């Protein structure tokens, strides 16, 4: 496996908290693949194309970052792209518990792929895509939490 990492999520939308994790991870890896996964437990408000466009615009022309969309297991996609690492952000103890459980399952499914946990910066630890979506849907100011404009709601 190369020094390639995958940062996977639904990113609906991609927040400044996600940007913080990428900023911290960039010096650690030769390449980071931001992978937009289809989460069947979530109803996506924004299309995959919108999310890809927002993220690509944020990171152009950084040669160390690639953006892709995928379906299926994250570890299977990691194997397909030759990534040896999964990046996961941690905001709180609940995130740690969930990520630890996912780590245990992923290790059984793909023993060669390691998980790197990166804590959120304190000022961004409360930021989540769910929070941003709620603010956006209520037509409240979401701009402190994302680096781009979301589409207007009719």
Predicted region positions:
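Nucleotidyltransferase catalytic core that binds NTPs
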Residues: 1-154
């Amino acid at each position: 496996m190369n020094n390639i990492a995958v940062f996977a999520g639904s990113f609906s939308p991609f927040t400044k908290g996600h940007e913080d994790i990428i900023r911290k991870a960039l010096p650690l890896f030769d390449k980071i693949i931001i992978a937009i996964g289809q989460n069947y437990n979530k109803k996506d408000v924004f299309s995959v194309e919108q999310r890809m466009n927002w993220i690509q615009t944020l990171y152009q022309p950084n040669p160390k970052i690639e953006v892709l969309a995928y379906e299926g297991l994250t570890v299977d996609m990691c194997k397909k792209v030759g990534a040896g690492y999964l990046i996961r952000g941690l905001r709180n103890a609940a995130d740690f518990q969930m990520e630890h459980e996912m780590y245990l399952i992923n290790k059984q499914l793909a023993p060669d792929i390691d998980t790197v946990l990166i804590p959120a910066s304190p000022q961004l630890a409360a930021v989540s895509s769910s929070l941003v979506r709620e603010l956006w849907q209520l037509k409240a100011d979401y701009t402190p939490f994302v680096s781009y404009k979301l589409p207007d709601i009719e």
